[in-house]
């Protein structure tokens, strides 16, 4: 089973990924694939550098590029464990790459939705090097994400978690959905 996590930056994908990890399920981050690629190419992991790398790999490999970069890792995990979570899918082309490559596996899309102002505050507190520092940077990043087709992927979701609540309430929602998904595996 392949579980694709989709959500705008700061929506809570990382918390959902932690819930799967606590159950011993491996998680691969699409964002890490871009950060690793930036490192390989000697490009700084700044918002501009990561944007450049993400656009460059898509130019070189097509719109499903980031999925293509992660497929070898996913293949190995599926062989060993039979289940993997892929955090940060952004485009319908990436979904298609996973479905094409793993046509014998069940592929589930789990979307996490959270309001923009809430996400902006979370990202400011998180403070990762590629996180936006200003509201305009945040809006630019959202525009880029939406340009990749993240909204389309969210509309294809098999499950949706709305993260507009307290942390504890969000944790309860996560546990409920994760349990439901895993009840169908293997």
Swiss-Prot record:
GO molecular function per UniProt: ATP binding
Recorded superkingdom: Archaea
Protein's UniProt keywords contain tRNA-binding: no
Family matches, as Gene3D superfamilies: P-loop containing nucleotide triphosphate hydrolases (3.40.50.300)
Keywords: ATP-binding, Nucleotide-binding
Residues that bind ATP: 7-14
Family: Belongs to the UPF0200 family.
HAMAP family in alphabetical order: UPF0200
PANTHER family, alphabetized: DEPHOSPHO-COA KINASE (PTHR41930:SF1), UPF0200 PROTEIN MJ1399 (PTHR41930)
Stated name of the protein: UPF0200 protein PH1008
Native species: Pyrococcus horikoshii (strain ATCC 700860 / DSM 12428 / JCM 9974 / NBRC 100139 / OT-3)
């Amino acid at each position: 089973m392949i579980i694709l996590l989709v959500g705008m930056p700061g929506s809570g994908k990382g918390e959902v990924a932690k819930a799967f990890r606590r159950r011993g399920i491996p998680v691969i981050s699409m964002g890490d694939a871009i950060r690793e690629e930036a490192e390989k190419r000697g490009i700084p992991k700044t918002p501009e550098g990561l944007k450049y790398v993400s656009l460059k790999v898509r130019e070189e490999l097509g719109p499903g590029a980031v999925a293509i970069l992660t497929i070898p890792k996913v293949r190995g995990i599926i062989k060993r464990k039979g289940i993997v979570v892929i955090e940060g899918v952004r485009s319908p082309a990436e979904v298609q790459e996973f479905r094409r490559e793993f046509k014998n596996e069940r592929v589930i899309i789990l979307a996490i939705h959270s309001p923009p102002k809430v996400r902006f505050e979370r990202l400011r507190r998180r403070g990762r090097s590629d996180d936006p520092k200003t509201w305009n940077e945040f809006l630019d990043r959202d525009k880029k994400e939406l340009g990749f087709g993240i909204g389309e992927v969210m509309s294809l979701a098999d499950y949706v978690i709305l993260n507009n609540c307290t942390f504890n309430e969000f944790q309860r929602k996560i546990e409920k959905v994760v349990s439901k998904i895993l009840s169908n595996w293997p």
